[in-house]
A protein has these predicted regions:
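Extended lipid/amphipathic-ligand handling interfaces
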Residues: 109
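Positively charged n-region of N-terminal signal peptides that target proteins for export
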Residues: 1-6
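Central antiparallel beta-sheet cores of small beta-barrel/beta-sandwich binding domains
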Residues: 21-106, 120-131, 135-136
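Bacterial N-terminal signal peptides
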Residues: 7-16
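Residue-level recognition of beta-strand termini and adjacent short loop/turns
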Residues: 113-115
Length: 136
């Protein structure tokens, strides 16, 4: 077999895997918003790439003792976007981390329908119900 063809075979074998990675990222790429009483309480912006990247902005998530969302305190809204770290996609789920001062928060964003997702804070000090996000 000619050398060119031999060298090309491994590249061709990787194409389906690259296409799968791109398709998985497309599920998540875009701007996602969580709302409470028609007000945006958190925005997640994700960009497809190698690896997927993004940031959270304006997130003010407050819950009651049952883990249900409650009215956010307007003074709690952070001004600057926070970059996400260690993003990993597995099927319909994106896990990522975000630094909050000295703390590292761990998140899981799961696509549950067309333009619909649920966010879980994996290491929250209080139990939280999934937070609904819609792609903008």
């Amino acid at each position: 077999m000619p050398r060119f063809v031999t060298a090309l075979l491994p590249l061709l074998a990787c194409l389906p895997l690259m296409a799968q990675a791109t398709d998985a990222q497309k599920k998540f790429a875009g701007t996602w918003e969580a709302k409470f009483k028609d007000k945006v309480i958190c925005t997640i912006r994700l960009k497809a790439g190698d690896p997927i990247s993004g940031e959270t902005a304006g997130c003010s998530i407050n819950v009651d003792e049952n883990g249900d969302l409650k009215e956010p305190d307007s003074a709690d809204r952070p001004d600057d976007p926070s970059p996400i770290f260690n993003p990993k996609i597995h099927d319909d789920t994106l896990t990522f981390e975000e630094k909050d001062g000295d703390e590292v928060l761990k998140f899981e964003l799961k696509v549950v329908g067309d333009g619909q997702a649920e966010l879980r804070i994996l290491n929250s000090p209080v139990p939280l119900k999934p937070i609904h996000f819609a792609r903008k």
